[in-house]
């Protein structure tokens, strides 16, 4: 648990600091320019070259207390609560040289790869008031050949010795005691071994943290037997991780430190434009073009976890020559392999930090883009019907669901604490027990392109701890002209709900004419929630835009301006994370400039529904969240808050549909809505099943109820809203009593 830094003065007037025990691992990134990134997914190539360093970091402690006998007793519980994450960062040399680490944060480990010259960083290393720990082939504190926990401990003890006179003596004594008490965790027997492969690497990192060290038997061999052998080892290791989580269980501290998702679905992807770029005017030779096209077709047609090679041209491109020759794969194949390795190690950092399970999906998930495109075209069509939209959604949902092996659904249905979708594919529409997963579970999505944004979003983060009073002022960025027909909907919706939250939330509205107004409004706001009210759009092959009063703006352009962005951004606008468009969405743009989580939309959203959604969200923060604190005696994370909102949206749309069709009357509407409300907000695993059961009491049979519910879902904004980023890392606590009680619970656990 992080504590505030405190100082005391010595007799000579110098200040002595407390000591922070967190360990931070740093990898220099000397090629951070996006124009130099890998062309299939957008990673810094130096990080791709150093994926092995990340693999090592994923096995290391998160702080100096974790490996003590006392720390090991609750190590796994702390990680499951997001309170002991492995922290590593890729930093450019320029950024490093501008930032000398203060003495109260001394446990820094700089990892230098083969291409890094230690002398490049010597001036920065020597600028510290303590000996920085540097791991390098030569010129560092520890070489890779001799690296071990014992060597790391020795280096940290030397750091403590150098901090005498800078850090409080009792803090140094405690740090030394922790370090001297480091013990390797007891090794445990998993009971089986698997062939090592990227598809199970994140799960193996989780199991490694839990003490299961000897879990592989060489490399994975069954690469020519279809997806079944891959699925088998994914299922096996996923089950082991989840059983370990079940063994540990919930702790009292989880009332305050809510657990992140127990399960992630991971589908690495490639920029769509890679497949669409013409080679006609390129400088490649005719043979080179044929090889590139062959590789593109292989990548595009990949269904499973490996490549299917269909002809001699593809064999030549894949192996670099005829079968039997020494393999010399095409540069694109090599680059894709390096991208996948880096992406896997980054997801492994997350799984090791949370003791969570990761299900790697076959590439079939990414091949559903054609069906998504058809549904998007239907959604945008001027003339459509309720039935046609339901049928169009059924088709795209069926395709996406079919791309997920059936063996994985037991874990998806049983997932606790939400599900994280690490994917560009629209996995949020997977059919789970008759409805899209986005209305059945609390979900958040981490985009996988561009690669450098993916890394920033997927790496573990310090939790943001808020209380309900941190939402006492909400900023609304208004970008609608008064003559716009939809400009009054926000006022109408807010005025209806304002009596319910006026004592707790104050609305601050800013009219946004241009980019400068937007940046000024953000910089002048120090609250936690900003809402954009206006129009959005995303044309094909262009960045998405928000329409301000005087101009359109691409949010990605604000990166160099570095505005202050609150942790939560809600975009009440159309197509802010549009389906069937490139990665340069407005929602991704807000993540890139610093938002912790963004609520975006994959389709156009009805202005009345959007205004009502925002008004109900403010009411939820003001009234439901405090009531939930009291009812369940625990805090809530933002993932739970918005997940409940989306489910309530579908419930309302469904009940209105049933009433409009004459299937229920007003009295039945109230009764059914109440049952659904209690099921959703009471934490029922499958609340809509409770609603269907209640409908039967009012004369609606199950078959008709489910038919109408699926139709309501296909036509509801509930399937358009999408949480992106890391909402699970924002925890909203009660205003009263949290800090003292949370500290007491944490100490009791320790």
Regions found by a protein language model. Give the residues of each.
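Domain-scale, conserved, charged regions that form catalytic cores
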Residues: 2-478, 482-510, 514-517, 521-524, ...
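Structural motif
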Residues: 418, 528-529, 568
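Catalytic cores of nucleophile-dependent amide-cleaving enzymes
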Residues: 10-12, 29-32, 135-143, 447-470, ...
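Short, low-complexity, polar/charged sequence segments that are solvent-exposed and flexible
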Residues: 44-48, 439-442, 494-498, 527-529, ...
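Active-site-proximal C-terminal subdomain of hydrolase catalytic domains
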Residues: 31, 37, 149-154, 160, ...
